[in-house]
C-alpha cells in the first residue's frame, strides 16, 4: 500500500498531536475522495494510502508500535500477512507476527496463532411446500434429509476402531506453521494435517478417515400454525455432522405456501371475492361466504355496489408470533345475468323503461350520472 512514511502521507510532523492528524486527514481525504476524482486510479490509490495512514496514526497503540518499529517493518508485516512470497522456515529474530498481529490485524490480516479446531458441520436448507389450510392450522411433517452424519464405527474420529488420531509432528498440534520473512513470522495452515492438528495413520474403513458418511435421515418436524411464505424454521444441530467430533450445523426449513383458488393472504388477513346476483345486490338479503372453517352467512344490504368490502372479524389467520387472529375481507362482485329467456329480457327492458331517462334516471344510477358529468366537464375544459 503506502510506500511513503505515514506522517509524510498526511503531511504532518512526527510530533503532531491527535487534533492535527485528524485535521490533516479530513483535508487530504476531501481532496482525494473517489467522488471528486471521477475514477482516477492513481487518486484512488492515494486515497487508500491516506485512509491507512490515518487508521494507524489516529490510534495511540498502533502509532506507538509504528514509531517503535518504523514504516519498513510495517510494510514487511503487511506483505507477509497478505500471503506474499516468503523465505524458508525457522530463523532467528523477534516474532513480529505476534507483536503486530493484535495491533495491526484489522489492516493487513495478521493475528496470533490459534489452536487447531475441527470444522463445524455445514448448515442445510429444506424447501417445504404447503397448502394454505396446512399453513393456517399447522402440521407435523416427515422430512427426508440427505446429509453427512457422524460415522458410528469410529464415533467421528476418522480413526480405525481401537486406534486414535495422532498429534501432527509438523505443527505440533497447532494446525499452523510459521514462515520467516526477514524480521517477521507469517502463519500458514499446516500442509501436513490441513489445519486439524492431527494425523490419522490408521483410518476407519467405513468413512475412510473422514469421520462422516453420507446418509438420508428422517426427521419429524412440527410446523406451527400461522406460518407463511418466507418463514424459516431453524432446527439446531440437524445439519451436517462436524468434522472429527466438531458441532453439527443447523437445518433450516424454508416455508412456501401454495396459491389458493379462493383465498389470498396478506399478513394475518384473508381476502376473497364473493359473487352476488344483481337482484340480491339491489334488494339485499343473506348470502353464504366461505371461510377456512366452513360456510357462514353474510347479510348484504340493499343497493350494494360491486367492489364493496365486508369484514368478518376473527375469520383470518392466527399469527404465529403474537397469537392475534386476522380477519376475512370479502369483496362483492355483482354478476350480470346471462342466457336470458325472451320473457326475462322483456322484464329487464320494462325495468329499464320504468327508470326513465336523463335526470329522472340519475337517482337510480348515481355513479353513471357522475361519470358522464365528469366526461362532459373534461371535454368542456379541452374546448375552453
Swiss-Prot record:
Pfam families with a match to the protein in the record? DnaJ, DnaJ_C, DnaJ_CXXCXGXG
Question: In this entry, which stretches build a coiled coil?
Answer: none
Q: Which residues cross the membrane?
A: none
Cofactor field: Zn(2+)
In this chain, Zn(2+) 1 is annotated as bound at 151, 154, 204, 207
Provide the GO biological process annotations. chaperone cofactor-dependent protein refolding; DNA replication; protein refolding; response to heat
Under the heading InterPro entries, the entry gives: DnaJ, DnaJ_C, DnaJ_domain, DnaJ_domain_CS, HSP40/DnaJ_pept-bd, HSP_DnaJ_Cys-rich_dom, HSP_DnaJ_Cys-rich_dom_sf, J_dom_sf
Q: Which GO terms describe its cellular component?
A: cytoplasm
CDD domains attached to this UniProt entry: DnaJ, DnaJ_C, DnaJ_zf
CR-type zinc finger locations on the chain? 138-216
Residue ranges constituting the J domain according to the UniProt record: 5-70
The entry's keywords: Chaperone, Cytoplasm, DNA replication, Metal-binding, Repeat, Stress response, Zinc, Zinc-finger
Q: Name one GO molecular function term.
A: ATP binding
Residues binding Zn(2+) 2, per UniProt: 168, 171, 190, 193
Q: How is the cofactor bound?
A: Binds 2 Zn(2+) ions per monomer.
Name where the CXXCXGXG motif repeats lie. Answer: 151-158, 168-175, 190-197, 204-211
Cellular localization per UniProt? Cytoplasm
What is recorded about the protein's domains?
Answer: The J domain is necessary and sufficient to stimulate DnaK ATPase activity. Zinc center 1 plays an important role in the autonomous, DnaK-independent chaperone activity of DnaJ. Zinc center 2 is essential for interaction with DnaK and for DnaJ activity.
Role summary = Participates actively in the response to hyperosmotic and heat shock by preventing the aggregation of stress-denatured proteins and by disaggregating proteins, also in an autonomous, DnaK-independent fashion. Unfolded proteins bind initially to DnaJ; upon interaction with the DnaJ-bound protein, DnaK hydrolyzes its bound ATP, resulting in the formation of a stable complex. GrpE releases ADP from DnaK; ATP binding to DnaK triggers the release of the substrate protein, thus completing the reaction cycle.
What family does this belong to? Belongs to the DnaJ family.
Q: What's the subunit arrangement here?
A: Homodimer.
User: What name does this protein carry?
Assistant: Chaperone protein DnaJ
Q: Which organism is it from?
A: Idiomarina loihiensis (strain ATCC BAA-735 / DSM 15497 / L2-TR)
